[in-house]
Amino acid sequence: MSEFIAENRGADAITRPNWSAVFSVAFCVACLIIVEFLPVSLLTPMAQDLGISEGVAGQSVTVTAFVAMFASLFITQTIQATDRRYVVILFAVLLTLSCLLVSFANSFSLLLIGRACLGLALGGFWAMSASLTMRLVPPRTVPKALSVIFGAVSIALVIAAPLGCFLGELIGWRNVFNAAAAMGVLCIFWIIKSLPSLPGEPSHQKQNTFRLLQRPGVMAGMIAIFMSFAGQFAFFTYIRPVYMTLAGFGVDGLTLVLLSFGIASFVGTSLSSFILKRSVKLALAGAPFVLALSALVLTLWGSDKIVATGVAIIWGLTFALIPVGWSTWITRSLADQAEKAGSIQVAVIQLANTCGAAIGGYALDNIGLTSPLMLSGTLMLLTALLVTAKVKMKKS
């Protein structure tokens, strides 16, 4: 309890938000997301240049996610009392190094090393994002600051693939990663200029990461996080075959649907701080319930293009509340161990993404076209019920 009080006293001492630092963190996160998904739009030229198949080249994305999962779990135990400012600078350096290694890769092995560097930065940065945010702004401003960071994520997710595809045709895939390295250098300088000293955890406050799961409501929260993200990836990973077959969209129509989804996600993220100020628990229970209903509507009436488009927009708008909401939950309910809680959260999300996509794919191949929707809807409904019944929430 003394640790919790000490942490909150430190937070209360922040009377004015450091928006420059918040935006530097948001920019760095956006760069990480863009670089994570660049290979998706550059697989063919990368594979041809390196003399490998597109399937093998695609493992560069898998390696990043795999390394990120483990990095998120162990980063806080590794860095311990190190000033977080230097740690964030290191992550920006790893981002830049990753881009350069990929750009100059003449073998698949070097490509994987470069992508592993990105995984270290990605997992570590995500694990620390909530705790960094709560140390840069006053407590009541944390949801707004988190919405800025996740808004940057939404923008990055929308532009990553089309930007990579366009620039790849224009300047070649290697120069695309060189340009990304230049963004990494900008991240380094912006962080050095704006991020204040953020001392690490004193030795007497060290606590085993997984002991946090013994606290009331924490295990339920992590299970809810797992189910909500698994439900998201069970649906979104297979949105192309579902929408093209069930609703009859062509490639151009699907592109517009995905763009609408991305814009709705950005709008939802932008509005999330206002909703979360009213009730974090209501948002975390209400959002998956709306998504469960959306999955049901799409399953029953998804052959209508207007209905299918409407569901995509509602889904993007609503799901945007979930990542911001759970990060806000950590900053409020686990404020004394926000870094360690963030580590577990990121690992759970990475595992959920993998499981959701894998099980959704199995269901699609072996049960039927709408089975990923039913799986997603079921997981979202269970999430809403679990949050309502078991997840504990501290007031700000």
Curated annotation (Swiss-Prot):
Residues 1-21, 76-85, 129-147, 197-215, 277-281, 327-343, 388-396 are cytoplasmic. Signal peptide: none annotated. It catalyses: inosine(in) + H(+)(out) = inosine(out) + H(+)(in); guanosine(in) + H(+)(out) = guanosine(out) + H(+)(in). InterPro entries: MFS, MFS_dom, MFS_Efflux_Transporters, MFS_NepI, MFS_trans_sf. The chain crosses the membrane at residues 22-42, 55-75, 86-106, 108-128, 148-168, 176-196, 216-236, 256-276, 282-302, 306-326, 344-364, 367-387. Pfam families: MFS_1 (PF07690). Involved in the efflux of purine ribonucleosides, such as inosine and guanosine. Residues 43-54, 107, 169-175, 237-255, 303-305, 365-366 are periplasmic. Keywords: Antiport, Cell inner membrane, Cell membrane, Membrane, Transmembrane, Transmembrane helix, Transport. SUPFAM superfamilies: MFS general substrate transporter. Belongs to the major facilitator superfamily. DHA1 family. NepI (TC 2.A.1.2.26) subfamily. This is Purine ribonucleoside efflux pump NepI. GO terms for cellular component: plasma membrane. HAMAP family: MFS_NepI. It is found in: Cell inner membrane. One of its GO terms (molecular function) is purine nucleoside transmembrane transporter activity. It is a multi-pass membrane protein.
